[in-house]
Amino acid sequence: MSRCGNLLRNARPKSAFMSQAIAPNEVWITHVTEFRIPAGKAYLSPIVDCFDGMPISWSISCSPDAEMANSSLLGTCSQLGEGEHPIVHSDRGCHYRWPGWIGICSEYGLRRSMSRKGSSPDNARAEGLFGRLKVEFFYGCDWTGVTMERFIELLDEYLVWYRDEKIKSDLGYRSPMQYRKDLGLAA
């Protein structure tokens, strides 16, 4: 057992282990990744919809704390329609076992799912997003002289671009937002 304790014995509903969804707000994934630049460290915690890989909400912080994870989850929950109770899949990190996170999940009727211990392939969609983000946005850039505030602005701008404009072949060469608009799922 980790130092954070185990607040939920069987955290994964049997039907939850999937990376695809046939409609928005069926299965979400979340994770935290770190960026190190000369000015310090920044942490990103997105909520990604497995329907189309759209980052629905995210938090960026200089501290990987529960407030960061809770903020991204609350931002996503505020967009739920009536009767929508998605599965939210995460790794077994402390953020996802704290009473605050569990309380938000309970309040919004979210079904929690957690990766098996030490099994990063269980959260492959999140790892894939981070890999793409770091290749396109982070690696190969000289971040010398960039303040943390500016870095966070640039990271946020990239995520907005990824959601609204990044063309993805698996979505018929459309961005996640355009894909939803074409299906009549977004305004």
Predicted regions and their residues:
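Charged DNA-binding/catalytic regions of mobile-element recombinases
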Residues: 1-187
